[in-house]
């Protein structure tokens, strides 16, 4: 019996395709930072947003967010330390928004 081979997609390529879907993006970013201390969560969140922007196209995200492309790259690089205003603009550019909820407390 002949083995059937299926074509596989490299993990990052598949992830970049998934990150074009706003519903997936919300789950991806929320899951990435859930339960982390603030110091870690902020770096991971910015890295995640940068990956989403890359997947959706930095030029397109820059145009939709009203942020110059060069400024977008600078803000989302490692240790870029973007302002809340910049993050809000980028999230607008990738088609999602921030929301808040009451923190669950341990009993």
Positions of PLM-derived features:
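N-terminal flexible/basic segments that precede or flank functional cores
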Residues: 1-47
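Short, charged recognition helix plus adjacent turn
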Residues: 9, 99-107
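Amphipathic alpha-helical interface surfaces
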Residues: 25, 41, 45, 49, ...
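Alpha-solenoid HEAT/Armadillo repeat architecture
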Residues: 34, 54, 77-80
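Short alpha-helical DNA-recognition segment
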Residues: 54-74
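DNA major-groove recognition helix of helix-turn-helix/homeodomain DNA-binding modules
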Residues: 83-101
